[in-house]
Amino acid sequence: MRAARTARPLASVLLALGVLAAGPATGQELPSFRLEMKNGRFEPTEIVVPANTRFKLVLHNAGTDAEEFESLELKKEKVLAPGASSFVVFAPLKPGRYRFFGEFHPDTAQGHIVAR
């Protein structure tokens, strides 16, 4: 009988720790924005996102050559083969303008993420 009384509080504590370790389950999708790469250019060249909010940038390379999304300021880099799609998740950004470019076509593949 004594073992049963001890086991219940222990089970409750373990359950509570498991719930806390799992983190919040909001069930909400991240705001998502799309960037297309094609023939050494990005479309759109400016992406406006909500400031102080995590978001996802969906990348698609519609061109015939590999292309890279890179932002030194945001410390993000992703290379995509022709026809490939991927995504990058960004931590909340402070209001501002953040440059990105394609390293394979740095003169033409340029743009900005604007957090407002």
Model-identified regions with their sequence ranges:
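Bacterial N-terminal signal peptides that target proteins for export
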Residues: 2-13
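Structural beta-strand segments of beta-rich domains
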Residues: 45, 53-57
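Extracellular/periplasmic metallocenter environments
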Residues: 28-34, 41, 80-116
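Asparagine-centered strand-capping/turn motif at beta-strand->loop junctions
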Residues: 59-61
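Sec/Tat signal peptide C-region and signal peptidase I cleavage site
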Residues: 23-27
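Bacterial N-terminal signal peptides
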Residues: 11-21
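Short beta-strand/loop motifs in extracellular/secreted proteins, especially
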Residues: 55, 65-67, 109
